[in-house]
Amino acid sequence: KITPDSTLTPSGSENGMLAQRLEGQDFQDLAFGTSDAKTITVSWYAKTSATGAGNYTVKVEYHNGSANYAVNKLFAFTTTWTRYTYTIPATGTATSVGIVDSNALGFRVEYHLFAGPDDVHSQFTQWTSNSTPTYKVISGQKNFMDNTNNELYITGLQIEVGDTATSFEHISHGEQLRRCQRYCVVYGGTGTRHLGCASAYNSTNINLSMHLPVPMRAVPSPTTILTSGNWLQVYMGASGNISNAGISLTDIDADHNTLRAYITSAHSGLTAGQALWCHVLANAKLIVSAEI
């Protein structure tokens, strides 16, 4: 669900969208860049509030590592839950330009919410080189930002080989969680959360080995959400210290499954090698993200 918190009349190249970004290595079975390139069907469910109903540009895009190629189409979103399907033949650049084969951005589905006049263009009816400006909409696009009562709900996005949308594939909560944790792991909640045991690097900084629940897509970046200006509590014996410590992450193994967290200004008066234990404060968070 998304809703505007203020109104906006877009000008120039202002634009906004919801986008699902996907790894290129997961789309090699499409055989793009060859004469065997495959047709795909994208499907999803959507509905709007009464004021949010209108035509929305849906753009599907692939990347070859240096440029992107796209198709797009207008869809009328209404106040009733509806399943939409978008079948895209393997024409245009699909037979001549492949999808990057790595964990980098290779495929993206975009639901455009608004765009200024500079980003309004004619429809791409087949896979086409998508030159600047990248975020194009089709004439007739709804301005989702014209009313703070606008609401848009989207769920059940599915991408399949072929010209038919099959029933949405439901997977177990455990498997879905593992897939999500490839991109983001959150430590913290309403109560304190144990983060791990660490050793003092010097009098104020510490090294913490972090064992992630699954291998991540890439070396992640840390973000902290504070409570009363702090996020971390570090104990050396019974001596605890609460702080807004700095944190950086580096790989210990090539699978991005174990990390070294170097945490600065975590305590004081430490001796190198001293053992410590760390937890995230209640209502604070450490977010470890490897999003594309």
How does the language model describe each region?
Residues 1-292:
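Extracellular and organelle-lumenal recognition/adhesion modules and their flexible linkers in secreted
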